[in-house]
Amino acid sequence: MVRRYYLSILAMVALHLGAIAQPRIEQGNTQVWYGRVNQWTVSRQILRNELNLMKECGVNGYMIELAVWDGVDDKWSNEWIVRTQKNYRWLLRECRKRKIWLFVSIINDNMGKGKYGDTGPTLEKVYESALQLASIVKRGGSKGVIVQPVAETQTPTGQRFEQECRKILENFTLVYNGEGGHPKSTPEGFHFRAVHPAHIVSSVADDALVISDHGLIIRELSIDGGLESRGNPQKVSMWVKRLQQQGVAVVGYYAFKYDKFDPATIRALGEALK
């Protein structure tokens, strides 16, 4: 009798945990994600505000670039690596508490090419340090984490880093974003492909994770046409609804270089699915 009672309790706990896990990523059941991808380390209080509102509104994923453009002078130093690990572990805990996916893009293959004001080193020059970022992700564990090793893969070094991450992160859900951000398929070893459409009205494949990581669409979805601006809720809602009708699995809004709380855009993402 006692044994049966405890078994029933365990079954109820298992059902409860399953019910509150991150939603499955699948075509025909669109979910929306948000992230201040290059400014996520600016303020933990802003992150708390964002994550709490996302949970309330049904926004199911937070997106970051681990090699963040946070304006620091010591980027790629040992001190920066340690600080990045602390920030990542904190955010990972907060996302797990709320059952929100953490989408981690480790590096961008555009780095060091001067795009959007990036004057740092190329991946080739900081390759070993970049591998330390992959190790940070590994140490955090795979639960609730989706990893894009390289954004917009386009160089031999980026391809090599991608393959090394496949080995380091073999138990993780991996996303491919090769061919400069417009992959035509999902290669072996990856679970999904992410595409970066140029415009709100750009055609995308049904099976892709659709992320607004392109200079043109970032401007189109912003309130004033800028790269460092908050979102335009009406345009964001229209974009999400269009892709939901198509049945894509994920629509992700990149708050590219915005460093403040943007509740109107987060609400627009969630309400667009209703």
Predicted regions and their residues:
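Active-site mouth of glycoside hydrolases
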Residues: 24-185, 189
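Hydrophobic h-region of N-terminal signal peptides that target proteins for export
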Residues: 10-20
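Extended, alpha-helix-rich binding/interface surfaces that flank or overlap catalytic cores
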Residues: 259-274
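Bacterial N-terminal signal peptides that target proteins for export
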Residues: 1-9
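Positively charged, low-complexity intrinsically disordered regions
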Residues: 4-5, 17, 23-25, 32
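Extracellular glycoside hydrolase catalytic/binding regions
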Residues: 128, 144-259, 263
